[in-house]
Structure formats: structure tokens, C-alpha cells
From Swiss-Prot:
It comes from Pseudomonas fluorescens (strain Pf0-1). GO terms for biological process: pyridoxine biosynthetic process. InterPro entries: Aldolase_TIM (IPR013785), PyrdxlP_synth_PdxJ (IPR004569), Pyridoxine-5'_phos_synth (IPR036130). The lineage of its organism: Bacteria, Pseudomonadati, Pseudomonadota, Gammaproteobacteria, Pseudomonadales. It catalyses: 3-amino-2-oxopropyl phosphate + 1-deoxy-D-xylulose 5-phosphate = pyridoxine 5'-phosphate + phosphate + 2 H2O + H(+). This is Pyridoxine 5'-phosphate synthase. 3-amino-2-oxopropyl phosphate binds at residues 12, 23, 197, 218-219.
Amino acid sequence: MTISNRILLGVNIDHVATLRQARGTRYPDPVKAALDAEEAGADGITVHLREDRRHIQERDVLLLKDVLQTRMNFEMGVTEEMMAFAERIRPAHICLVPETRQELTTEGGLDVAGQEERIRAAVERLSKIGSEVSLFIDADERQIAASKRVGAPAIELHTGRYADAETPSEVAEELKRVADGVAFGLAQGLIVNAGHGLHYHNVEAVAAIKGINELNIGHALVAHALFVGFKSAVSEMKTLILAAARH
């Protein structure tokens, strides 16, 4: 991913699949959601194929690979199964994420510093198929520096702590943590993306941080789409982040 001169919006469609899997039906179709998102201005589509297959399925990923007009950001755990699948589909972008079976959603960043050899091997292997590999990490200098050392060209900073902050002082503290992480990542020569827990009422402050390349947003878009439709939900978010980034 070349660094854009404007902030990009990656739309995560996992929770369209969550709604489908709740009843084991064929609808709603995450592929349809992805195409609608592209029409509404999404710069890319993010999907997470989890080990437990709780939402996105292999078939979804294969279909998306064939029909997307933008690009796929394939989120995956660092497992042999996922590595082999990624080598099969060769997505434009791969984001390595931590994964545990009991979590409701990804609860924290990947501990790159604690497993550098393993992550370095994964980055090298996935880079050979032409994918740009990013690491989903906390906005922590130790993890950012480790990401640089293992050869990842990009990182995605976990904004969950900011999203969960309740008091004004906590929000300010966590926002500063993200902003500092962005600055440090850029100083390391990394492409810096961000995401997790962002919605229509908290995204503007993050989008205004200079240097962020892309925001990945999913749950809030799917929830808002229940009331306004998916295209409108994506379009509204795109308008918000572009306006915030210009100021």
C-alpha cells in the first residue's frame, strides 16, 4: 500500500457475515456488502478469517478475491492453516492479528516483541507472494520498533483503548497514545494504519491525526446500516474522516 495523500477508509464486513451465521442462512451476503461499500467510496475491504469461522468463511474470501475492484485486506492469525490459505489466494494486503477462541472480538495487539522470530518468518513468507504485510499492534513503542525489526512495511494501531475510554481525561490520554504511536511509526519508516472500536462519534479525533494512512472500520458501519443502508453508512463515514483529516 503506497502512502496516500488523503486518509483511506477500509471497510470491514465481518459482521455482515456474523448476522448470516447467526441463523445459518445464505443472507445477508458479505460479498454484496463489499460491492456496495466500494460503490459508496470504500478504499478497500477487510475480512478476518478466524480459526473458529464464526463469521467470514473461506467461500466469502474466494468470491471477494474474484470480484473486488479495490483491494482485499486479509486479517489472519499466525497459523500454518492461514499461511497456506493466504498463499493460495494472494491478497493485496495481509494483516497479522492475535486470536483466541473465547474473545468476542480482537482484544489486544499482536505481541511482536515477544515472538520476533515467529513473526519475522511469517512476514518473509507472506511477502514472497506479493502481499503487503501489516501487523495489528498496540500503540506502544516497543511493539512498533519490533515490527520494524521483523521487516513488516506497515502496522495497524489498535484503537480499542481509546474507543473504550470513558472520562475526558482517559479519552485524551488514549488519543495521545495513538498519536504518539503514529509519529513513532512514521519515524521508523512504516506505513501506519489504525482501527478497532471506531464509530461515528469518536472517529474524527483519530482521523485528524496527521500521518495515518488508513482507518479500518466495521461494526459501527454494519450497525448504522440497519437504519440507513450500507451505502449510506459507508458514505457518511467516508465524509466524516475526510473532513476531519483536512483540519
